[in-house]
Amino acid sequence: LTEAGITVRRRLTTRDVTAAGTWIDPDTGATGTTYPYTDSLLTAQRIHDGAILTARREDLVREFDPITPAPAVAVGDHAVLVSTTMEDITDALTGASRYISATLSTRAGILITSHPALRDAMLHLALDHERAATNVWTHLARQLRGRPRTDALTIAAVCYCLITDTVRAGIAADLDAALAEYRE
């Protein structure tokens, strides 16, 4: 990490993170007790929020697998498309609506690829509803293809970073990078 320019404040090592044990600081010799990650407050909070915990990365990768593509929509009046799509995403993030329109993925894909400011506006919406945003943007990305999928995966990755779910953030970023051919 130091070679990459990342400041390392402290190093701790442990034999196992799935069972109780001991950590050691190799620089100072200090030690302490560890407990399984499954017993942590973060794990309890993630489960309470509906997260699925699994021991296998492959199970997490499947959460991003493409599903039936969203149906096509006529763009029509761009201003109406922007306002209704933003409203529908806001409703999904705030829980005002449990129903997600079948065309929301398509409309969101059009918005986030049409202008960087619209894509960035989606990130701004996610700031107050980070956990919901991870679910919404993962779902939207699963229904999209090509560049809209890569942009939705990028938004999902950022949302996962906001809740410190670095594994899912990394998976979304890896999938996005694998689709680099669709980037301009």
For the regions a protein language model found, what residue spans apply to each?
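Charged, compositionally biased boundary regions
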Residues: 1-184
